[in-house]
């Protein structure tokens, strides 16, 4: 297996290599065909392809000269808007290499900038608009001021569907000579929730345990409870075998070294998959959220988990008797 970070090793280099995101690719291909584009704002959760798509667009626009014509900046890494201004000024001062009509600045984590810094960024974008285009990357659109939103074409990135994540993980596993079970893929997806970067990183971590990845090896490598074991524990608790369920949860924490907060997060996901009336699920979610909040405030983790399971059991038992 390669010692490189797999997420970087297998980062797509062209539109054709990008999984899913068909509508986004179609819009960006039009910009490439036209040879021009506006400022862009890519927004959406982490790991949904924003940085990858920005770099792919740079490669498609500039070909072999993409590095010379592209400046990557991270708003949280830079020492302030003055540093960004100076770097953009120096970058935009020279003409694009090749036949490109403009250069490209990719600014990650733009939503981490203060409002004042974003106002200054807006002026920088206007000042160098003649020969420079900006792609701003943000997790939260609410973190971007309206004057910047109005000067960009905004493109939303959503969490990737399970099928797309599975296909990419299988491709990487095959290339690295690793076997992975369907249950292991499910466990990775449960842990990462459509975040492709985290999913690939999780795959690489799990692969360090051997040439075959199972649900159990994923759980152990990522510090989570096996989803199968957690479902069995929930079923025990809700069928009234509370002593067995409590013993299992105690083992997850004490023997397995899994944090109570991680268990609560998994409980939330698994409990909402229960075959119960839909109107009960908000109540179940609220019970688990109360336990989560109490643990964050310093309450005893195991006690809160036991209490949440008992409340859910009581709720299910009561509604079944109506």
UniProtKB/Swiss-Prot annotation:
Coiled coil: none
Residues noted as binding ATP in the record, renumbered to the chain: 44-51
Quaternary organization: Heteromultimer composed of small subunits (RfcS) and large subunits (RfcL).
Source organism of the structure: Pyrobaculum arsenaticum (strain DSM 13514 / JCM 11321 / PZ6)
Statement: the UniProt record of this protein carries the keyword Ligase: no
Family membership noted in the UniProt record: Belongs to the activator 1 small subunits family. RfcS subfamily.
Identification of the protein by name: Replication factor C small subunit 2
InterPro entries (alphabetical): AAA+_ATPase, ATPase_AAA_core, DNA_pol3_clamp-load_cplx_C, DNA_Rep/Repair_Clamp_Loader, P-loop_NTPase, Rep_factor-C_ssu_arc, Rep_factorC_C, RFC_lid
GO molecular function, a single term: DNA clamp loader activity
Keywords tagged on the record: ATP-binding, DNA replication, Nucleotide-binding
Function as written in the Swiss-Prot or TrEMBL entry: Part of the RFC clamp loader complex which loads the PCNA sliding clamp onto DNA.
GO BP annotations listed: DNA repair; DNA-templated DNA replication
A GO cellular-component term linked to this record: DNA replication factor C complex
HAMAP family, per the entry: RfcS
